């Protein structure tokens, strides 16, 4: 038995304005070079643009977008007998949300547009409607997992 205590599970803090953990997770992923105030500005501007575009609660659009992009299953490279197989594995909710946020930010960075707030708001609205690059990435991951279903027993 190990002598070390078990690490306490970290809970994500909520942001100051919306009091939402998802917004804080988004801020921490968009953060570059420790400029957290700039990250907050970008997120809040994006949420304001979503409010103007859709005339609905931006948090519900954000939740819907993340729910739509969150994958249930992913593939993991596993080396078996000299060859590497892509083994499908199930993903937990926390890891799925983290992946979804990463994909949303990656897709919004690749978008053409004026600034990051505009690109992020457009990507979130598209993802909430069921379109955009992040949704395509999720579907591609699910297709990969389905194609490699034969290797599921290598888990």
From Swiss-Prot:
The keyword Transit peptide does not apply. Its main location: plastid. GO terms for biological process: translation. GO terms for molecular function: rRNA binding; structural constituent of ribosome. Keywords: Chloroplast, Plastid, Ribonucleoprotein, Ribosomal protein, RNA-binding, rRNA-binding. GO terms for cellular component: chloroplast; small ribosomal subunit. The keyword Ribonucleoprotein applies. It holds the Pfam family Ribosomal_S7. It is found in: Plastid, Chloroplast. Belongs to the universal ribosomal protein uS7 family. Part of the 30S ribosomal subunit. PANTHER family: RIBOSOMAL PROTEIN S7. One of the primary rRNA binding proteins, it binds directly to 16S rRNA where it nucleates assembly of the head domain of the 30S subunit. This is Small ribosomal subunit protein uS7c. It comes from Lilium superbum. The lineage of its organism: Eukaryota, Viridiplantae, Streptophyta, Embryophyta, Tracheophyta. The gene is rps7.
């Amino acid at each position: 038995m190990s002598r070390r205590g078990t690490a306490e599970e970290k809970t994500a803090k909520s942001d100051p304005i919306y009091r939402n953990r998802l917004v804080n997770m988004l801020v921490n992923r968009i953060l570059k070079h420790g400029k957290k105030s700039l990250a907050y500005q970008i997120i809040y501007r994006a949420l304001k643009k979503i409010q103007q575009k859709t005339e609905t609660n931006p948090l519900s659009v954000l939740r819907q977008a993340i729910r739509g992009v969150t994958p249930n299953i992913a593939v993991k490279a596993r080396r078996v007998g000299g060859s590497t197989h892509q083994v499908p594995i199930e993903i937990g909710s926390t890891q799925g949300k983290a992946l979804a946020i990463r994909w949303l930010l990656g897709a919004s960075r690749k978008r053409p547009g004026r600034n990051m707030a505009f690109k992020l708001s457009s990507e979130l609205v598209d993802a909430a409607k069921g379109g955009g690059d992040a949704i395509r990435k999720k579907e591609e991951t699910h297709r990969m997992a389905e194609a490699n279903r034969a290797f599921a027993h290598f888990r």
